Amino acid sequence: MSDGAELKMAAQKRLLTGSDLDKWKASKTFEELLRFVSSLAQSVRGRENSEHAEPVSPAIEALEALLEEMQGIAAHHPVLQDAATSRFGKVEFRDFHKEVQARAEALVLQVDPSLTDEQAQELAVYLGNAWGDCKRIDYGSGHELNFVCFLYGLWKYGVLSEHDFTNAVLRVFVKYMDVMRVLETKYWLEPAGSHGVWGLDDYHFLPFLFGAFQLATHKHLKPKSIHNPEVVELFENRYLYFGCIAFINRVKTTASLRWHSPMLDDISGVRSWTKVSEGMVKMYKAEVLGKLPIMQHFFFSRFLPVPDGVSPPRTSEEELADCSEHAHSTWGDCCGIPIPSAVAASEATRKHSKPLPFD
């Protein structure tokens, strides 16, 4: 793929209005994408991160190698230590993002060289946009969704099978999370929205959803266990949910979970992980797939067909227009006021020995 123009030919953004969103939510594409996410979640029910499915397919191994390469690309673009101090995103992220975009199609073909050029171009759109926004230096659930759509496309094109679903979460998505934690902490990626649209975490939703399914059959761990630091430390590498709590605790040190993550605190009062897992799917449907500030940036393609009757694609000039054309549910949701990352605030606190607010 030679440039961004080819990316736009392979996939298009089409959800621009509330009417478009209603058509999307009633569409077969919406239903099938949500079913895919639910199937991934069900495939890890009762499994720890290390409980992979055997045998491991060549496609899963190729995806793991791709993610290793992503870490290598990040290593090639270090943050300049003498750069001006800022609590906002590091500009070196743009160099990382530019290289990923330039190599996206080739990286897709490394996963399966038998993909057609058209298929590789489509998949490269989702892979290239799964790491954050290079202009705003931010990351949120829409970028996370792009990675899931990349996996969905590989499944629709026969590269992945349903047998791979467990490992797609426990080997591939877990490794994707590892890469994202590197990018979030290295480049101080800003959260795409003031508190995240859903209020769980500044960046992610799906590790909470998958993690709740992992814990659904656990006899001893309860949702309220997230308030016990020793339990969190013991299980952070075994379950995605506890891994997210551990990350939050490390970067948001100036107050309790109850203060900076009130929705997680509320969820901890639910009686069982089964109820949490059921609620997470409903929440993802409503607060991610059903919210225009996120879905107006969603790409449609041959394997994610556009619903009938939605708006035509915008021109390049319209894409670059003022963000007042976008829908926002809170200030800073999309491409407006930048929000400093909690990682940046935590680092500033460590260096200056006095607390700085992160929101």
Swiss-Prot record:
Major localization class: cytoplasm
The reaction(s) this protein catalyses: [protein]-peptidylproline (omega=180) = [protein]-peptidylproline (omega=0)
Pfam families the record matches: PTPA
Compartment(s): Cytoplasm
Source species, domain of life: Eukaryota
Keywords, sorted A to Z: Cytoplasm, Isomerase, Rotamase
Function: PPIases accelerate the folding of proteins. It catalyzes the cis-trans isomerization of proline imidic peptide bonds in oligopeptides. Acts as a regulatory subunit for PP2A-like phosphatases modulating their activity or substrate specificity, probably by inducing a conformational change in the catalytic subunit, a direct target of the PPIase. Can reactivate inactive phosphatase PP2A-phosphatase methylesterase complexes (PP2Ai) in presence of ATP and Mg(2+) by dissociating the inactive form from the complex.
Listed PANTHER family: SERINE/THREONINE-PROTEIN PHOSPHATASE 2A REGULATORY SUBUNIT B, SERINE_THREONINE-PROTEIN PHOSPHATASE 2A ACTIVATOR 2
Name of protein: Serine/threonine-protein phosphatase 2A activator 2
Organism, as annotated: Eremothecium gossypii (strain ATCC 10895 / CBS 109.51 / FGSC 9923 / NRRL Y-1056) (Yeast)
Lineage, highest ranks first: Eukaryota, Fungi, Dikarya, Ascomycota, Saccharomycotina
